Curated annotation (Swiss-Prot):
Subcellular location per the Swiss-Prot or TrEMBL entry: Secreted
Family matches, as Gene3D superfamilies: alpha/beta hydrolase
Residues annotated as transmembrane: none
InterPro entries, sorted: AB_hydrolase_fold, Tannase/feruloyl_esterase
Organism: Aspergillus oryzae (strain ATCC 42149 / RIB 40) (Yellow koji mold)
Protein name as catalogued: Probable feruloyl esterase B-2
Primary site of residence: secreted
GO function term, MF aspect, one: metal ion binding
Glycosylation, residue list: 53, 85, 98, 138, 246, 287, 311, 490, 516
GO CC terms of this entry: extracellular region
Pfam families: Tannase
Biological process annotations from GO: xylan catabolic process
Keywords in alphabetical order: Calcium, Carbohydrate metabolism, Disulfide bond, Glycoprotein, Hydrolase, Metal-binding, Polysaccharide degradation, Secreted, Serine esterase, Signal, Xylan degradation
Length: 526
């Protein structure tokens, strides 16, 4: 039996941990009485122990989340914050016991008013004092924008900024040391919100991680809407079934997979891929379930073409080849894209009965002229953010089935041209990484595990985690040259099959050998 003297250090450590937990819990329980901020109504303050599977009964059904596992002890604060006389945001702050002195805001997705609880859990678990809001409305529909410009303004820019202002005040109030640096993490609409902060609120964040950004958003809505005019409805002679999209994908890989030097099912640089589809056009007498008709081949060519406006100006770049299988069930499914339909019905034309099947580029011109509250988020002069010392890191999956990765390249070029700076100077504050094999924000056939979300988490090493890479860049001045991604053997959370270092744009990955394509050292950024 061990002596009492030997046990004393362990007993003392255990007692200290329990005391710390009790102190944190007590501090959280009494925190509501200390909150007295303008326009803020506290709904509740709860202590949530690590390991809790938190029930979310008030989360809108369309948001799809009924519970969230919380990894670390947090103080959860739920609030309503007025943004005008007729609008408010629902805001949550998760303040962790393992606080690292860092503040972080999360974003949203689509047109949705859904707090992304998985991001709150992920980032608070890493020690960030984290906030997340519903962007001023509840659910995934665009209907709340109908005749409510204040709600729309919340969605465009005010929700995230308001959450940052309130969240920073709460962080200073709860932790004696306040916060030393502030960060942003978001993807899709969350990526657009990140760039809106860079463009409009340059002092809100020291570091912004903005994935697959939905900037150029008015034209994105039009681009998404125009696919129906190309495919037609299910059963039309221009429509491709999912099986035919699989056949098309195999042909695209046959033509383009080896361009990067390795035939691994991943196209490292889709901009080099211009598939010629004559090879799979049906021969006389051939079963049309195994090949494309001439009209179907034309459909594919149109999908892989940019969208131009009524005067011939570029509105939105092409969809990148390689994404077609995943996109076929969402963008090319023979139905108008729902977000686009909502946008035109409830905002552009303020007519819930507007027929989305009749969309044309003339509608795109009407929408772009409106651009309410500058939803476009396409301003290319981000010099104020640079002067404030901010860093922005953006990434985009090259299998993205919802937002073309070409659009992120287009914005990068716009910034370089507008600010008159070459890539090596942009690198000082703005870095862009193309993630081969990544679909929209997560998933895909390649090494998409970069730590941008809980579902893509591998570890917290800055080389393997895009958020912690940003922290290292901001706090230590070590900028990331590559972002290592993990390919999981059986989807998220499974073992790592292989890793690949994704290159900083404008470099691209090329297989040099001599190892297998699963060897990250067999690839080189050129």
């Amino acid at each position: 039996m061990p002596s009492l003297r030997r046990l004393l250090p362990f007993l003392a450590a255990g007692s200290a941990a329990l005391a710390s937990q009790d102190t944190f819990q007590g501090k959280c329980t009494g925190f509501a009485d200390k909150i007295n901020l303008p326009n803020v109504r506290v709904n509740f303050v709860n202590y949530v122990p690590g390991g809790t599977n938190l029930s979310l009964p008030d989360n809108p059904t369309s948001c799809g989340t009924t519970s969230q596992v919380v990894s670390e002890d947090v103080c959860r604060i739920a609030m309503a914050v007025a943004t005008s006389n007729s609008s408010e945001i629902t805001l949550e702050a998760w303040l962790p016991q393992n606080y690292t002195g860092r503040f972080l805001s999360t974003g949203n997705g689509g047109l949705s008013g859904c707090i992304q609880y998985y991001d709150l859990a992920y980032t608070s678990g890493l020690g960030f004092a984290t906030v997340g809001a519903n962007s001023g409305h509840n659910g995934t529909s665009g209907e709340p924008f109908y005749h409510h410009p204040e709600v729309l303004e919340d969605f465009v820019h005010r929700s995230v900024h308001t959450g940052v202002v309130v969240g920073k005040q709460l962080t200073k109030l709860f932790y004696e040391e306040g916060f030393k640096k502030s960060y942003y993490l978001g993807c899709s609409t969350g990526g657009r919100q990140g760039f809106k902060s860079v463009q409009k609120y340059p002092n809100d964040f020291d570091g912004v991680v903005a994935g697959a950004p939905a900037f150029n958003m008015i034209n994105l809505m039009s681009w998404s809407a125009h696919f129906y005019s190309i495919t037609g409805p299910v059963g039309s002679d221009t429509y491709l079934s999912p099986d035919l999209w699989n056949i098309t994908h195999k042909e695209i890989l046959r033509q383009c997979d080896g361009i990067d030097g390795a035939e691994d099912g991943i196209i490292e640089d889709p901009s080099l891929c211009s598939p010629v589809l004559e090879a799979i056009i049906c021969k006389p007498g051939q079963n049309t379930t195994e090949c494309l008709t001439g009209k179907q081949a034309h459909t594919v060519r149109e999908i892989f073409s940019p969208l131009y406006g009524v005067n011939g100006t570029l509105l939105y770049p092409r969809m990148q080849p390689g994404s077609e299988v995943m996109a076929s069930s969402i963008m090319y499914n023979g139905q108008p894209f729902q977000y686009s339909a909502d946008w035109y019905r409830y905002v552009v034309y303020e007519n819930p009965n507007w027929d989305a099947t009749k969309f044309s580029v003339r509608d795109a011109a009407v929408a772009l002229k409106q651009n309410p509250f500058n939803l476009q988020t396409w301003d290319a002069d981000i010099s104020s953010f640079r002067k404030a010392g901010g860093k922005v890191l953006t990434y985009h999956g090259l299998m993205d089935q919802l937002i073309s990765s070409e659009n992120s390249k287009l914005y990068y070029a716009r910034v370089a041209e507008t600010m008159n700076v070459p890539p090596e100077e942009l690198d000082e504050f703005y870095r862009f990484f193309q993630i081969s094999g990544m679909a929209h924000c997560s998933g895909g056939d390649g090494a998409y595990g970069i730590g941008n979300q809980l579902v893509t988490y591998n570890d917290a090493n800055p080389e393997n985690n895009v958020l912690m890479a940003m922290v290292q860049w901001v706090e230590k001045g070590i900028a990331p040259e590559t972002i290592r991604g993990a390919k999981f053997t059986n989807g998220t959370g499974s073992a790592v099959e292989y890793t690949r270092k994704h290159c900083r744009y404008p470099r691209r990955n090329v297989y040099k050998g001599p190892g297998n394509y699963t060897d990250e050292n067999a690839w080189q950024c050129v």
